[in-house]
């Protein structure tokens, strides 16, 4: 019997893998590299109605921080009155893509009709286990105000009764389940705001697909003992690889999933050993996949990758950015028999939208109704460092913010976490040193110059649940000697640091100073506070930085340090967020 995928030819006589026959847009020149395509003039491919190369221009890096550069469109098209009311134009920088009204409306209808996991087409064993995982990882969900998961009390069943799918989980699971087991290639883009539960939005369909394949594939009894990789989740950083793997690995005991994390600390020997026992879900980076072709220990890596049926590319706007697209695209080309490709992103920059639609013309978009919106429950507070009493000292303004956070009586008895973002990585140690030496804070400084092991060690305390404090703060500062002050040219009233700041030194704060290297995807559990020491350069950076707090509809506080020359769009951010308007 002819294999199902034989009608999707890949290899030509010259050995070049042709993806055009499966909906991918690629060069027809056998042996030509994607790099040459990047530099060449695009040729129209009339058969596939797309360009024959990834649409990425050679742009100079902005050189700021550790983050990848993003596109900055100069489009000045005048928006309609309705668009003006629904979209916030972010200064002079390139706009994020506006969501398709039809797609957003369809998502709203689905969310209004489906409010329980039992209404979604998921295998019962998969649904129950993944709901348990969600419960164990949820700190506070808007539907769980009165019930908190406590593993020691084993109240997961009670917790699950109150657990509801997030809007993007509802939409993504519903849309993918309709054709989950259809044999043709299916390419989808899952787009939703930060902290909306996107990991589970792609993980549930992935696991459901694997378990259904085991049930429906007659040859599974033979395949299950083969050295194969069945699915891969790709991420841009090893911090995200670690985070996603911690979730995926919880599926092993109950569902019999063989999971594997292939990061910077993994050896090729370890990969080979894991492969012998079958890998159901591998979490890694594009670079690690491509490295398979450079070692002799792994025989015919193309055969291994040809067994992959389900691919997830998380933080897709980064992985298809100019700096990553060559590796990411090459990685996908080696997976010849894919059934599902899921791209996942919290932001859809216009350049990314052009790239993905040209590389994958058949891509279907699944978007949250709240795409490109900052959680309206977040409090956005502007602090003008040029005004008295700071007189141009951003460090003093930052110290006052941290003092205010320490005294705000939110989550009493628990350690508080604050993440501070700066634009330049050179400023990270400077800011951290001042906070530690002058104000006695427990500060961690992290940049891309740190090794993977160092970064993972530094962020671990911020990813674990908040610690309960066993000692009380000093009582030296009392209501009688505390001074309340209004910050000039801001919308916040805080307490002034007293001259005797011994109580201030005994802080329960844990502070992380970093750049945009940690602005994407990282789930800082229990982090209610984000400080933007510098104004973000792009709307993408703004959305991702602010998205480190207020996750899963929790409340968070964001402090933005500004100056006299602050632009009007910065002043408008608090109003835009409170009105729940999309940022474009």
From Swiss-Prot:
Stretches for region Disordered: 28-92
Reaction catalysis annotation: ATP + H2O = ADP + phosphate + H(+)
Alphabetical UniProt keywords: ATP-binding, Helicase, Hydrolase, Mitochondrion, Nucleotide-binding, RNA-binding, Transit peptide
Subcellular location: Mitochondrion
Placement of sequence motif Q motif: 162-169
Transit peptide: 1-49
Annotated Gene3D superfamilies: P-loop containing nucleotide triphosphate hydrolases
Family: Belongs to the DEAD box helicase family. MRH4 subfamily.
Comment block on domains: The Q motif is unique to and characteristic of the DEAD box family of RNA helicases and controls ATP binding and hydrolysis.
Protein name per its UniProtKB record: ATP-dependent RNA helicase MRH4, mitochondrial
Organism in which the protein naturally occurs: Kluyveromyces lactis (strain ATCC 8585 / CBS 2359 / DSM 70799 / NBRC 1267 / NRRL Y-1140 / WM37) (Yeast)
